[in-house]
Amino acid sequence: MEIRKIKAQTVCDTVKKLFTDCNYFIGKDIMCALETARDNESSPVGKSVLSQIIENDKIAAREEVPLCQDTGMAVLFVEYGDRVVIEDGSFDEAVNEGVRRAYIDGYLRKSVVNDPVFDRINTKDNTPAIIHTKIVLSLIHISEPTRRSYIS
């Protein structure tokens, strides 16, 4: 049986890029939907609001800054190959380091607290990520609802 080896740094780098990109770039499909909504809007106020949202999205992409001040929590849905081995670290540690780097290096709002019930101390890097894992045959990829990132 063939074993697939993936370096922890590859997982980390992929997660960092995924989270940075999804906070800076809205996606062509959503931009198209916003433009269509603006063009079909009959209310001048509604048209103006949609135009401002579109302009904000263009600025975020051009200047690589977050689309919104609330950049949310890191939630991943991972399909993890049954014959995959992570080298030089663990999968969870690599994912959390990627999230950490994205939120720190990408200037994303860090709002996760370590213990939401008692101490409520901000982790200052938006970790730990919430990782939903499903074991699948032979391949690994990390995705969020509108984007996929495959690790080769």
Task: Set out the residue ranges of the language-model regions.
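Cytosolic covalent-transfer regions centered on His/Cys nucleophiles
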Residues: D21, I30, A37, V45-G46, ...
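Flexible, glycine/charged-enriched surface loops at secondary-structure junctions
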Residues: I26-L34, V45-L50, E64, D105-F118
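Translation machinery proteins
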Residues: N40-V65, I121, D125
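Residues forming anionic-ligand binding surfaces in small-molecule and nucleic-acid pockets
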Residues: T71-G72, R147
